[in-house]
C-alpha cells in the first residue's frame, strides 16, 4: 500500500510540473495527430478491448453510462501505454541496426506529453467518481503496477464495496476527506464475524441504554468501551462467540459448549449471549453497592437508598401487557427475580421514554438497575415495586441460561408453569417431594431398566377386582391371605360321612389292591380283542412281528409257571441269592476245568516224560489263564481285569504269588523240544527253587558293567541338566522383548472409540439419576418454607390445610387465604410442620420446646464413630439428670 501511495504522489507531482507545458504541446500533438493519416495497429486492438462488454452485465442499470465511459478511458489509457512499450522495443531494434532518427525521438516525447495530459484528466475523473461513491482506497495506482488484463479490477472492487453500504456509521466513516497513513494500515479485509458484529452495533439496545453512566460520558464511553471479543479475560463472552459461530451440522456439540459457560460475577447467573464483558462490568460496578433482589425490602426499611449509589440484577420472568395510566401515557410492568429465591419477586414499572425504548425487551433477559426508585404497592400487597426514570439506568446483560419451567405435571394432567432454576433442579418446590419419592422407590442399579411392576394386560390370567387388588396376596395380623383362605375353606367344607362295613375292617388282598389301582389308572379290566389289521401285521414275516411273538410267548410261560406276587422274608431272600451265586461259581469252575483238560490232552508231545504229563494233567490254580486258539481274536479287556479270563472269580485278598504266564500249545511244544535237545547234548538244567529268597550273587564282569553304567549316568552335572530349561527360559524372555510381541501387546482394536462411547453412555445412564436425586436433596434441604393455600375457621379459631367435616356440615365461617408452611426439628430428631412462625405444641418425643428451622428433607446422618457413641458414665437415668447441671 505504501508503494502505491508513493507512486501516486510521484505521478501527481509530475502532472503539476507539466501543466505549463501541456497547452503548447497539445497544439503540436493535434497537428501531429492530424498529420499522421495511418492509425496504429495497437490503438485499434485496445480500442476494441475497451468496450467493456464482458463487465456490463454486473453493473447496475443506472450506472451503465458512467461505467462505459470509465472503461473506455481506462482502455485508451492502457492502450497508449502499450504503444509506448512497443515503440521502445521498435527503437531498440532500430538502434541495433543504426542510430535512431530525430523525428522518431521527438514523436516519442510528444506522445509522452499527450499521455500525461490524458492521465491527468483521467485521474481527476476517477477522483470525482470515488468521492461520489464514498470509497476509501483510490484505485488509480493499480494500472501502474498490474498488467493490462487486470485493468478493470477497480470496477469490481467498487461494486463489491457498494453492496456493504447499509449502515449510516459505515458511510459516515467513508465520507472522511483525508485520512492519515496510520489509518490506512487498518484497512484490511475483515472477517464475516467482525463485519456482521459491526453492522449490528447500532441496532443493539445496549448502546441505547449504556450501563450505569452519566449522560455526558455516554458518548465517550461508547466509543472507548472495548468489545467483548477484545477483552482477554472475558471467558464467558468468548465462549458464547464460539458457540454462535457453530455450523448447523455441529448442533450436537452444543451442550458441551454450554457447560463451559462461566457464571457472571455480579448477578451470579449464567448468560447465553452476554453483551457486556467482565472487565467492563467491574469498571462500571466500581464504587457502587450491590444489593440482591430479596434484600431490597429489608434495605428499604433500614437504610436510605436515595443517598447511596446501589445496583441490583434480575431476570425478567413475566411481562404484563402494557396499560394506560389516567394521564393517557402507556406504561408496562416487569416481574423480576434473581433465580436464587423464587418465592420473592420484584415489580418494575416503566413509564414514558423508558417504556418507549425498552418495551421490546424479551422475557428471560438479565438486566441491571441503577438507583431504582421505590414505589408504594397496592393495598394488601407486600410486593416490592420499583421504577426507573431514565433508559440509561437499565443495563441489558444477556439471556438467562438457567431459566425454565417445572417438568412435572399437575393433578389435572396439565404441565406445571412454576419457574425453576434449571442449574439447581428441574422441579418446583411443590412437585419435588413427589418426584423424589418416585425416584427413591426404584433401585439405583435399575434406574434406566425395567424393575418389576405389573404384568401386561394381555398376559394376565384374570382381570377381576380381587385379582387386581390382591395379586401377590397380603398379610394381616401375621397371617398371609393364602394360608387364611385355605384354613377357612377347610373349615367351611362339609365333612363326608363314612359308613363302617366289614370290608373296611378286613385287610384286603393283593388282587383287590391291583383291581383298585387299575380302576384309578383307567386301565380296562377285560382284554381287548385284536383287530384284523393287527393280526395281518403280526402274520407278516418281519423281524418286528417275530420279536413281538417271542416276547408274548415268554410272558405267557413266565406268567403260568410263577405266581404274580411272592411273599418272602429278607433273610430267606439273602440265603436264596447266596445259594444261587455258589451254584453259578461251581458250574463255571467245572466248565473251565473240562475245557482245559480237553485242550491239553489234544496237544501232547510223545517226547514228553511221564512226570511232565502228570504235571500237565493236574488241575489248574484258581484264576489261571487258560490257553486259547491262535486263530480266535481276543477282545480288548480293561487294565483292571488284565490277566483274568471271562467268567473267572476275582479274589481281592489272595496273598499267593501270581501264576506264571501259560504258553500256547505250539510254544509249549517248542519249549519241550528244546529241553530234549539240551539233554541229548548232556547239559543238565538245574531247577530253580521257588522257596529260595536269597539272590544269586552276580559275576565280576556283570558288576563292572553295572558300575560303568552308573558312573556314566552320574557324569552329567546338575548345571547341564538345568541348561535346557534355562535355554528355554531365555528364548521365552527374548520373545517377550521382541518387536513382534511388543507390537502384539500395543495392538488395539479399531472399535475402541465405539467401546468408549458405549461405556460413557452406560456411565451417563447410571449417574444421571443419581445426580438428579442429589440435586433434589439439596433443593429440599434448602427449602425451609413453602407457600400454600390454607383455610381458617373463625368459628372454631383454627387454621389448617382443609376444614373439618363438622365445620363444613355446620356451615361455619370459613376463610380461605394464602399461608406459609414451615418446617421445624427438635434436637431429639423429631420433626413437625407449622403454619405459624413457631409450633404451638411441645415435642411429642422428648416433651421439650426447642424447635429449630429445618428443610423440607430430613438430613441424613451417617454411621457414628466410637467417640460419639461412648458413654463414660453409662446410660443416664431420669433421677440422676440433676447431676449434669
Curated annotation (Swiss-Prot):
Residues 1-153 are annotated as: N-terminal domain. One of its GO terms (molecular function) is enzyme binding. It comes from Mus musculus. There is a cross-link at residues 639, 772-773 (Glycyl lysine isopeptide (Lys-Gly) (interchain with G-Cter in SUMO2)). GO terms for biological process: cell population proliferation; DNA damage response; DNA replication initiation. Residues 193-217, 236-260 have a biased composition (Polar residues). Residues 37-56, 80-89 have a biased composition (Acidic residues). This is Protein MCM10 homolog. One of its GO terms (cellular component) is nucleoplasm. Residues 101-139 form a coiled coil.
Amino acid at each position: 500500500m505504501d508503494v502505491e501511495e508513493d507512486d501516486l504522489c510521484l505521478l501527481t507531482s509530475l502532472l503539476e510540473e507539466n501543466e505549463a507545458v501541456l497547452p503548447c504541446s497539445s497544439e503540436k500533438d493535434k497537428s501531429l495527430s492530424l498529420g499522421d493519416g495511418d492509425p496504429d495497429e495497437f490503438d485499434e486492438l485496445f480500442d476494441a478491448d475497451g468496450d467493456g462488454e464482458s463487465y456490463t452485465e454486473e453493473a447496475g442499470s443506472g450506472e451503465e453510462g458512467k461505467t462505459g465511459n470509465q472503461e473506455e478511458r481506462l482502455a485508451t489509457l492502457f492502450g497508449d501505454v502499450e504503444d509506448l512499450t512497443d515503440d521502445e522495443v521498435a527503437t531498440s531494434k532500430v538502434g541495433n541496426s543504426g542510430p535512431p532518427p530525430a523525428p522518431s525521438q521527438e514523436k516519442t516525447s510528444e506522445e509522452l506529453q499527450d499521455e500525461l495530459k490524458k492521465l491527468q484528466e483521467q485521474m481527476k475523473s476517477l477522483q470525482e467518481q470515488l468521492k461520489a461513491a464514498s470509497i476509501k482506497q483510490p484505485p488509480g495506482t493499480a494500472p501502474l503496477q498490474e498488467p493490462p488484463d487486470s485493468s478493470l479490477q477497480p470496477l469490481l472492487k467498487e461494486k463489491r464495496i457498494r453492496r456493504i453500504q447499509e449502515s449510516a456509521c459505515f458511510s459516515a466513516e467513508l465520507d472522511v476527506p483525508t485520512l492519515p497513513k496510520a489509518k490506512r494500515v487498518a484497512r484490511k479485509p475483515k472477517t464475516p464475524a467482525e463485519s456482521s458484529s459491526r453492522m449490528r452495533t447500532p441496532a443493539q439496545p445496549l448502546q441505547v441504554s449504556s450501563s450505569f453512566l452519566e449522560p455526558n460520558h455516554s458518548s465517550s464511553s461508547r466509543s472507548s468501551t472495548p468489545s467483548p471479543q477484545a477483552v482477554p479475560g472475558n471467558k464467558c463472552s468468548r465462549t458464547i462467540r464460539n458457540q454462535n459461530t457453530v455450523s448447523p451440522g455441529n448442533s450436537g456439540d452444543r451442550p458441551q459448549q454450554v457447560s463451559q459457560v462461566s457464571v457472571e460475577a455480579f448477578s451470579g447467573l449464567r448468560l447465553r449471549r452476554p453483551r457486556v464483558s467482565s472487565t467492563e462490568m467491574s469498571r462500571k460496578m466500581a464504587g457502587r453497592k450491590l444489593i440482591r433482589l430479596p434484600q431490597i425490602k429489608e434495605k428499604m426499611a433500614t437504610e436510605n437508598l436515595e443517598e447511596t449509589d446501589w445496583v441490583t440484577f434480575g431476570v425478567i420472568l413475566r411481562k404484563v401487557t402494557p396499560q394506560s395510566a389516567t394521564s393517557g401515557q402507556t406504561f408496562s410492568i416487569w416481574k423480576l427475580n434473581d433465580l436464587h429465591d423464587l418465592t420473592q419477586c420484584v415489580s418494575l414499572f416503566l413509564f414514558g421514554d423508558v417504556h418507549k425504548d425498552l418495551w421490546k425487551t424479551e422475557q428471560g433477559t438479565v438486566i441491571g438497575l441503577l438507583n431504582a426508585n421505590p414505589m408504594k404497592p397496592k393495598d394488601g400487597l407486600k410486593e416490592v415495586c420499583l421504577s426507573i426514570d431514565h433508559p440509561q439506568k437499565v443495563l441489558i446483560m444477556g439471556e438467562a441460561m438457567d431459566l425454565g419451567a417445572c417438568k412435572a405435571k399437575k393433578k389435572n394432567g396439565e404441565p406445571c408453569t412454576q419457574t425453576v432454576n434449571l442449574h439447581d433442579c428441574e422441579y418446583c418446590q411443590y412437585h419435588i417431594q413427589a418426584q423424589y419419592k418416585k425416584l427413591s422407590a426404584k433401585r439405583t442399579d435399575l434406574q434406566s431398566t425395567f424393575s418389576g411392576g405389573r404384568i401386561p394386560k394381555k398376559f394376565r390370567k384374570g382381570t377381576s377386582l380381587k385379582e387386581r387388588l390382591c395379586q401377590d396376596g397380603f398379610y394381616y395380623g401375621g397371617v398371609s391371605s393364602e394360608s387364611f383362605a385355605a384354613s377357612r375353606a377347610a373349615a367351611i367344607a362339609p365333612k363326608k360321612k363314612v359308613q363302617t362295613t366289614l370290608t373296611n375292617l378286613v385287610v384286603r388282598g393283593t388282587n383287590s389292591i391291583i383291581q383298585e389301582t387299575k380302576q384309578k389308572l383307567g386301565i380296562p379290566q377285560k382284554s381287548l380283542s385284536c383287530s384284523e389289521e393287527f393280526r395281518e401285521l403280526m402274520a407278516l414275516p418281519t423281524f418286528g412281528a417275530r420279536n413281538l411273538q417271542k416276547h408274548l410267548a415268554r410272558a405267557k410261560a413266565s406268567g403260568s409257571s410263577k405266581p404274580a406276587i411272592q411273599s418272602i422274608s429278607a433273610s430267606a431272600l439273602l440265603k436264596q441269592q447266596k445259594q444261587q451265586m455258589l451254584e453259578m461259581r461251581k458250574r463255571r469252575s467245572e466248565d473251565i476245568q473240562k475245557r482245559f483238560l480237553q485242550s491239553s490232552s489234544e496237544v501232547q508231545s510223545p517226547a514228553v516224560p511221564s512226570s511232565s504229563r502228570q504235571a500237565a494233567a493236574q488241575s489248574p490254580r484258581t484264576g489261571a489263564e487258560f490257553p486259547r486258539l491262535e486263530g480266535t481274536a481276543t477282545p480288548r479287556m480293561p487294565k483292571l481285569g488284565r490277566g483274568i479270563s471271562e467268567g473267572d472269580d476275582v479274589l481281592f485278598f489272595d496273598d499267593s504269588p501270581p501264576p506264571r504266564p501259560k504258553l500256547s500249545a505250539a510254544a509249549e511244544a517248542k519249549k519241550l523240544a528244546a529241553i530234549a535237545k539240551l539233554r541229548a547234548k548232556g547239559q543238565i538244567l538245574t531247577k530253580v527253587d521257588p522257596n529260595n529268597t536269597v539272590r544269586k550273587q552276580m559275576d565280576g564282569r556283570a558288576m563292572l558293567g553295572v558300575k560303568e553304567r552308573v558312573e556314566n549316568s552320574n557324569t552329567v552335572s546338575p548345571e547341564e541338566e538345568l541348561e535346557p530349561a534355562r535355554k528355554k527360559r531365555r528364548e521365552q524372555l527374548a520373545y517377550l522383548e521382541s518387536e513382534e510381541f511388543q507390537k502384539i501387546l500395543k495392538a488395539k482394536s479399531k472399535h475402541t472409540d465405539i467401546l468408549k462411547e458405549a461405556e460413557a453412555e452406560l456411565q451417563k445412564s447410571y449417574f444421571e439419576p443419581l445426580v438428579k436425586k442429589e440435586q433434589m436433596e439439596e433443593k429440599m434441604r434448602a427449602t425451609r418454607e413453602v407457600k400454600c393455600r390454607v383455610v381458617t375457621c373463625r368459628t372454631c379459631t383454627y387454621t389448617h390445610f382443609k376444614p373439618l367435616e363438622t365445620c363444613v356440615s355446620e356451615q361455619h365461617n370459613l376463610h380461605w387465604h394464602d399461608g406459609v408452611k414451615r418446617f421445624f426439628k427438635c434436637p431429639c430428631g423429631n420433626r413437625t410442620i407449622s403454619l405459624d412462625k413457631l409450633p404451638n405444641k411441645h415435642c411429642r418425643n422428648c416433651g421439650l420446646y426447642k424447635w429449630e428451622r429445618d428443610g423440607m428433607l430430613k438430613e441424613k446422618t451417617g454411621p457414628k464413630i466410637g467417640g460419639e457413641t461412648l458413654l463414660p458414665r453409662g446410660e443416664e437415668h431420669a433421677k440422676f439428670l440433676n447431676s449434669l447441671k
